[in-house]
Every structure is written in structure tokens, then in C-alpha cells.
Amino acid sequence: MYRRVLLAALAAAVMVLLAACVFEFDNAGGMVAGTLKEHRETVEMSDKYKTGKPMELNLDMDMAKAVLDSTDESLVDVKFSYSSKALKPELKVDEDEIRIRNRLEGYSFGKAVNNWDVKVTDKLPLEVEVKADASDIRLDMSRMQVNSIDAELNASSARMYFDEQNKVPADKFRINADASSADIYGAGNLGFDVMEIDADASKLNIDLTGFNQKDGEVRIDANASSVKLRLPEDADIRIVIDNYEISSININNDRILSRSEKEYISKNYGNAVRSLEIYADLNITTLTVE
């Protein structure tokens, strides 16, 4: 009887300890353990942030799983979950900048939890900068006012959504991917002037459809990568292959015709209300056009 009581007490103690811990499994099957901490913070909207200039939004993350969405209730609202103090993200807000980053100071590089849930205002124009190392990010900027985007991905995966027409003109959209993957949906809704794509050992799927009436330009510099483009149907399309080293081009769109080995145009070129020019520099890369 005594032994049964002792075993029951030990089992209860173990359950209490487990309740205070986080256990996750990564893709390789390794177990993640640590005490889970949580931090919430909200910065309310006020007139001091309405300067008439775009607000800078800087996200700088390491080993994170991050979700970005919009809010109409505050300037920024964050919820962080982390299993190591060294991973704790820091939120800093000035009159012209929202900055979030985690520094990895003193971290031993074991497996850990570092989750971001970030909501940013849809009331102000934003200049978005993202730096992601060994991270998994989901950015839904459909209802935000996006002036520009500059994303650097290193050994990371990203999904970006632009499901609604941008409320302000976007100057540029730049993505630099190194050993990473990115899926971009509805990029045409941004109404960008120039999209710059720099890919090295990466896989990119870019949906250029969406509503806008601006001419645009896409510049691709890809090395040992796979790039897939989905084209809008309401634009004149011209594709120019500036450099072509041990690469392949797959045209899976009946609208696109070949003018030469390095130039393609859409049917009835010159009749659409806007144009999209695509310039590609390819090295050991597969470019697919749909």
C-alpha cells in the first residue's frame, strides 16, 4: 500500500514538472525542452506617430517562428513565447520606427521555442524590412499600407500574402534569399515599380497577379535556384533573359510567345493598359512561367 502511494506521489510530481516545460519535435525528430515564457505588449495609436512620413517596420529574427498580421485597434500588438531568455525578442517603438529583434546573446544553440505573433497598424504607411535567419515566417500584409519591402532570408522559409489592393503606392519590393524558400501571393496588388529578386540555392514561387494599373518591372538574379512566376492576365508581358548559364526556361502559359532564344512577349503585346517587364540573369537555375 505504501509503495502505491509513493508511486502516485512521484507520478503527480512528474506531471507538475512536465506542465512547466515545453516539449516540441523538430523536422529531424529532435526534442525541444525548456521552461516556456510569454511576453505581451501593446502600444496604442496616438497623434505622435502620424507624422505624414512612412513608419519603418524592422523585424530582425533568429531561429524564430513568426506571424505578422494587421490591426486597426493599436499601433502594434505583440505576443512572444520563448524557452530561453537569450531568445527573448525586444520591441522598441519610436515616432518613426517599430523595431523587433532577438539577439541570441548567451544562447547555447540547443533546440528551443521562439514564437512571434505580431500585429501592426493598418492606419499608417509602412516601410517594411525583414531579416530572417533559420526562421519560419508568415507575413500577411493584405490590409497594410506598404510603401516598400526589403526582405533578407538566410536558411529560412517565408510566406507573404497581399490579398487586397495596396492603399498607397509601393516603390520597391526586394527579396534576397540564400538557401531559403519563399511563396509570395498576390504581389501584383502592391502596385510596385520594381521588384528585385536575388536567389542563391533557393526556391521561390511568386504570384504576380493582382489589381493595379501601374507599369512594373521584375529583375531576377538567380544562382542554383528554382524560380516560378505566375503572370497577370491584364498586362503586356515582356521577358528578357540577360544571361543564361546552364539553366532551363519552362513557359507554361499560352499567352507567352517566343521572339528569340532570350526574349518572350505576350500575345497582342501593346494593347493592355499596363506592362510588366521581366529581366532575368540565370546561372544553373530553372525559371518557370505560368
Features from the language model and the residues they span:
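Positively charged n-region of N-terminal signal peptides that target proteins for export
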Residues: 1-5
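Sec-dependent N-terminal signal peptides
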Residues: 7-13
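C-terminal motif of bacterial Sec signal peptides marking the signal peptidase cleavage site
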Residues: 17-20
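Short linear S-[DN]-x-LW-Φ motif typified by the pepsin-like aspartic protease active-site region
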Residues: 23-101, 113-131, 136-152, 160-163, ...
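Short, surface-exposed interaction patches in beta-rich subdomains
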Residues: 40-48, 99, 103-112, 160-290
